[in-house]
Amino acid sequence: MANPEPSPLMSEFQHLMIQVRSGNSAEFAVKSNDILLRARSGEHKDSELEALVRMERALFGIGDEERIGTELRWCMDRFNSISPGSLNHGISILNMAAWHRNKGETMMALATHSNLSPSSGHPKQLLGLSRLEVGRMLASLDDLSTAMRHLWAARGFLSESEMVPEALAASLEWLDIALDEVNDIAPRMQERIQNAKPRNESGTTWIPANSQDVREVVEMLLPVLLADVSGTDRADLGLVLDAAEMLEEEGWIASLVEKAEDIQDPRLLELLQS
């Protein structure tokens, strides 16, 4: 079923946002306020558009700074009421969570992210971005095993959504944690995700990575990373080399050596030549 045509007022707002994203934001405050007033009442009344405009104005920093969080929460609650599980609802959750994190309220940010879930029908690309952020926050709290689960889920959602740069980031961040300890008998990541349960006690956890999961990630990363090995700080290629040495994968090392003439990272070159 085709999406309905946007209303003239919604089209006007969409055009305004295109201008803003092109760098023409000088009149955003005035024009968005005019659209907001029309969306609130009369023949143009549109609750979804009102929430969209208020969310963008809050993100733009229009109004009292103390009220930005209140505005973002109002928008999230409004989208939850009129279109739960929608793209706009998911974006409003991400914005609210980011606001909490920027305020240093990590636990509130994590709690907000929990409102994004497959069972609620949220788009996979938003689920992927959410899991990526949750994984990063958990890693910052040293809850590495749980962080690995979320990063693994993120790479799956992001890959399915063809968000290649974000999927690569999730894969590399997972690998960076996983290489702390790898063996052949640890549960696979998919099993860990499926069997995950709320913990009865607070604190950090650790479960080693399974070597097959490491191989899966590196085999996905290697051709992409080798396509361009330039740059003087290539920690990503360093992770691949670490994984190759840990798992005794001579083929991975050989692939890196073949690119030695193009590699510019002095530390990586030294390791390859040692």
Annotated model-derived regions:
Residues 3-4, 43, 83-84, 122, ...:
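Structural signature of alpha-solenoid helical repeat scaffolds
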Residues 19, 39, 59, 100, ...:
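Residue at a conserved register position within TPR or TPR-like alpha-solenoid repeats
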Residues 33-40, 73-81, 114-121, 152-160, ...:
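Amphipathic alpha-helical segments of tetratricopeptide repeats
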Residues 7, 47-49, 84-88, 126, ...:
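Structural signature of alpha-solenoid helical repeat junctions
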Residues 14, 18, 47, 53-56, ...:
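"A position-specific structural signal for the A-helix of alpha-solenoid helical repeats
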